[in-house]
């Protein structure tokens, strides 16, 4: 969702609260708890969950390995649920012609640097960079080329924009900032 006037433009960036992240976090947690319960069932010698039988699993070495996979999967699932809860990567791009500044704002992990804010002058922007890589895992990103600094990404890496959408977004932004578009 974007908002634009003659002197002001805001682009909202969607973070990690995506349907795919919810799906994978749930699947990973379910599988990890299944592995952990079968591993613990083989240790205790009784079924902790009735439909997951432990009888074919000897605790050493299969039960230990299943417990390890269950703990590792639970930890990774907890990480995914944390990124969803804190909405890591969400934020906005603000372009203000009146003040002549660009502000890139993102939410990070909790701590001292949770709020990530990059601010620079519009005079320092050289061009809009558009990177397009086709193939099995296509990558399409927009970047701001800034004098004397590294490029600043404007789009989320996991965002699956079509070539037409990324071109339209680049053209709108270039028209608003009155600068050129370059390819990488």
Swiss-Prot record:
Keywords annotated in UniProt: Chloroplast, Membrane, Photosynthesis, Plastid, Thylakoid, Transmembrane, Transmembrane helix
Protein's membrane topology: Multi-pass membrane protein
Regions crossing the membrane: 21-43, 58-80
UniProt-annotated location(s): Plastid, Chloroplast thylakoid membrane
GO process terms (BP): photosynthesis
Chief location: plastid
Domain of life: Eukaryota
GO cellular component assignments: chloroplast thylakoid membrane; photosystem I
Family the UniProt entry places it in: Belongs to the Ycf4 family.
Cited function: Seems to be required for the assembly of the photosystem I complex.
Official protein name in the record: Photosystem I assembly protein Ycf4
Source organism (scientific name): Anthoceros angustus
Upper taxonomic lineage: Eukaryota, Viridiplantae, Streptophyta, Embryophyta, Anthocerotophyta
Gene designation: ycf4
């Amino acid at each position: 969702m974007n908002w634009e006037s003659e002197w002001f433009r805001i682009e909202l960036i969607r973070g990690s609260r995506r349907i795919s992240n919810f799906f994978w976090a749930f699947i990973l947690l379910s599988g990890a708890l299944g592995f952990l319960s079968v591993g613990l069932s083989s240790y205790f010698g009784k079924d902790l969950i009735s439909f997951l039988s432990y009888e074919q699993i000897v605790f050493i070495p299969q039960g230990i390995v299943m417990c390890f996979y269950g703990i590792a999967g639970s930890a990774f699932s907890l990480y995914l649920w944390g990124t969803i809860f804190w909405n890591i990567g969400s934020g906005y791009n603000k372009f203000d012609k009146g003040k002549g500044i660009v502000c890139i704002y993102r939410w990070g992990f909790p701590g001292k640097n949770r709020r990530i804010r990059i601010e620079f002058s519009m005079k320092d922007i050289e061009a809009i960079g558009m990177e397009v890589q086709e193939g099995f895992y296509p990558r399409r990103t927009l970047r701001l080329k800034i004098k004397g600094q590294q490029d600043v990404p404007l789009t989320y890496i996991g965002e699956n924009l079509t070539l037409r959408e990324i071109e339209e977004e680049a053209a709108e932004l270039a028209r608003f900032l009155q600068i050129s578009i370059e390819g990488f």
